[in-house]
Structure formats: C-alpha cells, structure tokens
Amino acid sequence: MATNARRRRSAAHGAQPNPSGPVNAGFALGNFKLPLILIAALLLLIFTSRVQQNDVVLWSFVSATAVLAAWLVYLLVLSNRRAEIHDFSIVLRSQHYVQLLIQICLFTYWGYYWRPVYDHALLIIAQLLFAYSFDILLAWSRRRAYTLGFGPFPIILSINLFLWFRDDWFYMQFLMIAVGFMGKEYVRWQREGRSVHIFNPSAFALGLFSAVLILTNTTSLTWGQEIASTLTLAPNIYTFLFLLGLIVMYLFSITLVAGMAAITLFACGALYNATVGVPYFLDSEIPAAVFLGLHLLITDPSTSPRTPLGKTLFGVLYGLGVFGLYTLLDSLGAPTFYDKLLCVPLLNLSVIAIDRAVRSIKSETLLNVWRADWLGGRANLAHMSVWVMVFVVMTALGKTDGKHTGDSLPFWEQACSNDLSNSCQRLVQLKTTYCNDNTAWACNELGIHFRQGLIVDRNDSQAQEYFGQSCELKFKAACANLLDDSLVLKDDPHELDLRLLLRQGGLNLMNASSNELYERACDHDWQFACSSNRNTL
C-alpha cells in the first residue's frame, strides 16, 4: 500500500527539481546508475560466443548499446544542467510475475524438444536488458517517473513466443521491441477517466511487423514459420498449455476471453468440417500456436474489456478473426501463422466500444448470467468448470493432442480424388513438407504430380529434381522415374519414410519398433501396413 502511494507521488512529480540546486562540481549519476548497469550488462553480452559467432548479431548489439548509451548521456547532461532528479519506484504486479513464470515454464518445455529455443535464450536476455533500458530512458525523456517491476518480462517473452528475426537480421528484433514500448507510451486514450495504452505492447509490435513482413514478402527473415510448427514437437502440448492457462484463468479471471475464443474456433471448425468434409485447419482443430495465443496474447487485462459479457464478445471476435484471417492469408499466398497476430490490435481498438455497448444493456434477461456477482462472486470458477468440460470433451474426441484426421495422408489423397475443397492443395503442401524432411516417398509423389500436371501445373524440371532427391534417398521407383520420362512409378512408403510420415507434428519416430510403426500406419489408413506384406527398407 505504501509502495503504491510512493508510485502515485512519483508519477505525479516526474522529473523533480534538485533541492540542492545546480551541480557545478561534476556530474551526479543519481538514479542513472540503474540504466547504466543495464546497458553495461548488455555491453558485456557482446563478448559471449553466441553473439561473436555472427557479425550481424554482433553489430546489432554494438548499435543498440551505443544508442542507449548516447541517450543516457544526453539525459544525464540535461538533468544536471536543469538540476532535475529522475525518479523511479518499485511496484511488483502479480499479473506480470505470474505470466513470467508461466512463460518460462513454456520456453523450458518447448525448448527441451526444439533446441533452437535454448540457443536463443541469451538473445532473449539481451532483449530484456534492452527493453528495461529503453523503457526507463523513454519515461525519463518524457519527464515521468519510471515504475520498475516485472512489466517488460511478459512483453519480451510474448514477442519471442511468436516471432524471432534470424541472426542475419537480428537488429530488427531490437527495433520491434522499441516500437512496442513506444506504442505503449505514445498511443493512448482515456478509459474510465485514466490515460491508458490502447494496445497490448507485444501484440502491437507483432501485429505491425507481421503486416510489414506480409506486404514485403519477407517472412523468410524470421523464424516465425518454424516457431508456429515446432510447438507440437513437445508431447501433449495442448494439455500443457491448458494446464498453464488454468493458473492464469484462476488468478486473473480471463476465462471468458480465452475459453470463448477456443470454443468459437472449435465450433467454426466443426461446422466447416461437417459442411465441406475436410478439416478447416490442416492437421488440427486449433493450431497449437493459436491455442497459445488465446491464452497469453489476448488476455492482457489492460487492453481487454472489463465487463463479463464484454470479455465473452472479445473472445468470440478473436476466434472469428483468426478463423477468417486463416483463409484470407492462404488465398493471398501469405503464411497463415500470422492469423493469430494480426487481429489483436484491431480488437484492442474495439475494447471501449464493446464495454460501452454491453453497459447500455439494461435487460434482466439471459444476458445477465454474466454478472460479476453470479454464484456469490464465484462466477469465474463456474466459467472455468465449463471450459474444463469443453476441453475434456474435445480431447476425448481427438481434437487436441493425439491423432487428428488431417494427420493422415491417405485421407487427403482420398479427399483430393473426391475433389473436396482445398484438399489437393493441402495434399501437395503436406507432401512438400515431408519431402523437405527427406521423406523419399513424398519426394517421389511430388515428382509424379509435377510430371502428370493433374493437381499442379506440369513442370518437368521440377519433377526431375524431386525424383533425383528421392532416388538419392534410395527409393527405387524414383530412380526408374528419373531415368525414363514416360514413367510415373509409385511404391509404398519404406519403414524410414513412415518414421517421418506418422509423427503427427511431433518428434520423428526413430526409436519406435517396427510393430508399433506399422500399427500406427494402419491406424492412419495406410492399407499396406495392415497386411502381412510389408515393404521395409
């Protein structure tokens, strides 16, 4: 309570005149020691092997440190000239450090199965040092007292859960962080009599940079696609995210936002599947990265509705936004993983309108089941109970972890032969993914598709490349196709191919026994695997 009082006094006074008057005998560091230590720590990271191994990363660190140091010197000179004291107070908010712990758990679990996460850890630490330094200097530049706490942690970790720039473009990562904090500082409005930031800082930076990457067709500069697709390498990732989400839901009452977003996506996907005959998302009811986003990206209390019904509408709109953007991005030829990022800033803009519309409802009808005093103030527990039941049911139906209809290549081949919506395009997409993983069978299949020109435009040179790749992987049918342009020989996947084809978005099945492998293949509708005549390599 005393801490909050000190924070309010500091915020009110901002940069305060020094009661001792101007300092003539040299400079007084005062509170500038804090950003100086942070900048010095960032400078020291330059000498680590992770930074030294790439020149662009190295010069990105040097440039970021130089900019921060110059900014600090400028403010220090100015404050001494004006005899001002730049203040800060320590305020620890539970939503910040709880989200920090949740995100660390996720990075640790995910990184155990996808090691680039651990390799990226030092760069995340550098981003945190940069973020704290930048945020402090920005506040003091605006002659405002700085509130020191865990606030930058969830911002930086959220950004890194969805988008990293590759080493050769790493300076863009620092720029993205700077944009996020500047948006928090400058893009504000009056809400309930207080000046607050409009956008979730991480979502603002992610949304803006996602739009630029799409417009410039430069997604390859980032790890975005890999991040979105490797979450499922961690076993039972949906259950893991669900359990982490329950902690946040219980402590901060965000169940209506996250739960309704998920339920909306489940419902829309089920309706699409029933109508068209194929899954809406390629191999899941909700992509794992989207499931992560609806738990950690849209649930910021500062940039989401305050009313229960408003939270419900916010979650529904996020679900509908992701659902629509997936198709829109796909039709534009853009990577679909941006779907979860682009709609958040737009939803943040709608927050006041949503709350105003909800508060204008005076009816005592069904809408009021979302009142805060429902069940003696324990409405959130009731909402959580509903969400738990929904997740349990969807898991029992195979809609979260485990085998999904879209994991089966024979399913997509049958759907393509029946000319179901987008099925041929997705079949080629899946085979391309597996061929890139050096699945010999998939490469031969792609060669056949490009030679025949039935579901893709005919391209003989492309076909030869795929046949050559498959032949190098010792797939005999591909070698024959490579030598004779008139052939389109097929064969069943070899055992090594199955270890890649049946991974269901997870780790390769290199340690599975042959019996386990063929049982899984049979379960995935590979008919040859259900018989005793098996083709092994």
Model-predicted segments: where are they?
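Hydrophobic face of amphipathic alpha-helices that form TPR/SEL1-like repeat modules
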Residues: 430, 445-452, 481-488, 500-504, ...
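Short coil/turn and helix-start
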Residues: 417-422, 436-437, 454-458, 472, ...
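Internal active-site segments that recognize and position negatively charged phosphoryl groups
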Residues: 205-206, 213-266, 270-274
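N-terminal signal-anchor module of multipass membrane proteins
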Residues: 17-140
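Internal/C-terminal transmembrane anchor helices
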Residues: 375-401
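Membrane-interface helix-loop-helix junctions at boundaries between adjacent transmembrane segments
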Residues: 138-231
